[in-house]
From Swiss-Prot:
Keyword Oxidoreductase: yes
Residue positions of the active site: C11
Organism: Rhizobium meliloti (strain 1021) (Ensifer meliloti)
Annotated keywords: Arsenical resistance, Oxidoreductase
Gene disruption phenotype: Disruption mutant shows selective sensitivity to arsenate. Does not affect sensitivity to antimonate [Sb(V)].
Protein name, as recorded: Arsenate reductase
Gene coding for it: arsC
Catalytic activity field: [glutaredoxin]-dithiol + arsenate + glutathione + H(+) = glutathionyl-S-S-[glutaredoxin] + arsenite + H2O
Positions marked as site (Important for activity. Involved in arsenate binding and transition-state stabilization): R59, R93, R106
InterPro entries: Arsenate_reductase, Arsenate_reductase-like, Thioredoxin-like_sf
Enzyme Commission designation: 1.20.4.1
UniProt key word Oxidoreductase: yes
Length: 140
C-alpha cells in the first residue's frame, strides 16, 4: 500500500499521524512539504480529494496569513493557492494520501479512517492520549 504524508517534523499532530501510519505496518513516503512543496496541481488535487475548500486547507496560526490579508473573504481560491505555494507554511498539515482516501489529518487520528485495520497493539499520542487499545482497535 502506497501512502504519502505531507509532513512537518516540527508539528506534533504531523508526528503523531506519521507514527500511526507506521503503527499500521506501513512505511509511507514522507514529503517534508516546507522543503519540497507540492506543485499547484498536486495541492489542488489533494484539497479536492480531501473534500475541502482551499480556505479550509489554509493554515492561519504561526503563518503570514494575517499580514498577507488572506482572511479577506473577497480573496479568490487562486489568490489563496498562490500564497500557499509562495509560503508553504500556509498549507495546513498533515495531508495524507492513501488508496483508501485523502485527508487533512487534524486531529491526527483522522488518518485511521484511510488506513487498513492492521495496527500493531496499543498506540498513544506524544501527549499520552490513548488512540488504540492493546488489540489495535480505535479508542477515540
Amino acid at each position: 500500500m502506497t501512502v504519502t504524508i505531507y509532513h512537518n517534523p516540527a508539528c506534533g499532530t504531523s508526528r503523531n499521524t506519521l507514527a500511526m501510519i507506521r503503527n499500521a505496518g506501513i512505511e509511507p513516503t514522507v514529503v517534508e512539504y516546507l522543503k519540497n512543496p507540492p506543485s499547484r496541481a498536486e495541492l489542488e488535487a489533494m484539497i479536492a480529494a480531501a473534500g475541502l475548500t482551499v480556505r479550509q486547507a489554509i493554515r492561519e496560526k504561526g503563518t503570514p496569513f494575517a499580514e498577507l490579508g488572506l482572511g479577506d473573504p473577497s480573496r479568490s481560491d487562486e489568490e489563496l493557492l498562490d500564497a500557499m505555494l509562495e509560503h508553504p507554511i500556509l498549507i495546513n498539515r498533515p495531508f495524507v494520501v492513501a488508496p483508501l482516501g485523502t485527508r487533512l489529518c487534524r486531529p491526527s487520528e483522522v488518518v485511521l479512517d484511510i488506513l487498513p485495520d492492521t495496527h500493531k497493539g496499543p498506540f498513544s499520542k506524544e501527549d499520552g492520549e490513548a488512540v488504540l487499545d492493546a488489540g489495535g482497535k480505535r479508542i477515540v
